[in-house]
Design a protein with these regions (language model features):
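ABC family nucleotide-binding domain
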Residues: 15-241
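ABC-family P-loop ATPase nucleotide-binding domain
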Residues: 1-24, 264-267
């Protein structure tokens, strides 16, 4: 099934899993988000692209309560609207986090815990699931990303790519409805980027619901169902990847893609 067919099927089959409308966020004098809208359907991969400082990570963190917008409305899976004009309660923020899991740019593994203990920490301590069940699932997930032999290693004994794969497994172990990736390859050596992108692409092919912030445009073009181009805290343009990458409607989008993709064409 092509991306276009897949997106049409996803977007016509059910109501959105998540809707964000008119998100605004200011840090001091810097208005980072100026009315961002985002709609995400179950089983869909939405990719956010744009220059540094465009607000991509702030959008991502706003979707699971790590950042609280100053204004805007968020609806998750048909639940009650969260209106950020009134700061949400701690319970509401925790409810958002319970439904999602984030893979961070710098891995954010606990340095004093082994790989397996990093993976089982959330399911055991937060979700309070049975240890035997959690251990079996964690080992299965480590096996699928090629890290069975690293379960007793510590993060400092792993390469950056291995650490990020552990970060992905840790997120999957929480059984989230929504996976959030914040530039998961930007802190990696170029030679290690591919191994992480392969894992994320496999998750996309399996139908995981994901929002991904990335500068890897070739990956975005291949894996995304829907792409948003942000600049200056607004969504300049959005659409299916084949449309946005081959025939962007806005001059700003064209300039960004030309500058980013031109060096890649000569590699």
């Amino acid at each position: 099934m092509s991306h276009a067919d897949r997106q049409r099927a996803v977007r016509s089959s059910a109501p959105p899993l998540l809707t964000a409308r008119e998100l605004h966020k200011r840090f001091g004098d810097n208005e980072v988000l100026k009315g961002v809208d985002l709609t995400l359907y179950r089983g869909e991969v939405v990719v956010l692209i744009g220059p540094s400082g465009s607000g991509k990570t702030t959008v991502l963190r706003s979707l699971n309560g790590l950042e609280t917008p100053d204004a805007g409305v968020l609806t998750l899976d048909g639940g009650p609207e969260i209106d950020f004009v009134t700061p949400p309660s701690k319970r509401t923020r925790f409810a958002l986090r319970d439904r999602s899991a984030m893979v961070f740019q710098h891995h954010n593994l606990f340095p004093h815990l082994t790989v397996i203990n990093n993976v089982i920490e959330g399911p055991l301590r937060v979700q309070r699931r049975p240890k035997d069940e959690v251990m079996a699932e964690a080992r299965g997930l480590l096996a699928r990303v090629g890290l069975s032999d690293k379960e007793n290693a510590y993060p400092h004994e792993l390469s950056g790519g291995q650490q990020q794969r552990v970060g992905i497994v840790r997120a999957l172990a929480l059984r989230p409805d929504l996976l959030l990736f914040d530039e998961p390859t930007s802190a990696l050596d170029p030679e290690l980027v591919g191994e992480v992108l392969i894992v994320i692409k496999e998750l996309a092919d399996e139908g995981w619901t994901m929002v991904v912030v990335t500068h890897e445009l070739a990956f975005a073009r291949e894996a995304a169902d829907h792409v948003l181009f942000l600049d200056g805290g607004v969504v300049v343009e959005e659409g299916p990847p084949q449309q946005l990458f081959t025939a962007p409607a806005h001059e700003r989008t064209r300039r960004f893609l030309t500058r980013i993709m031109r060096p890649l064409d000569g590699v």
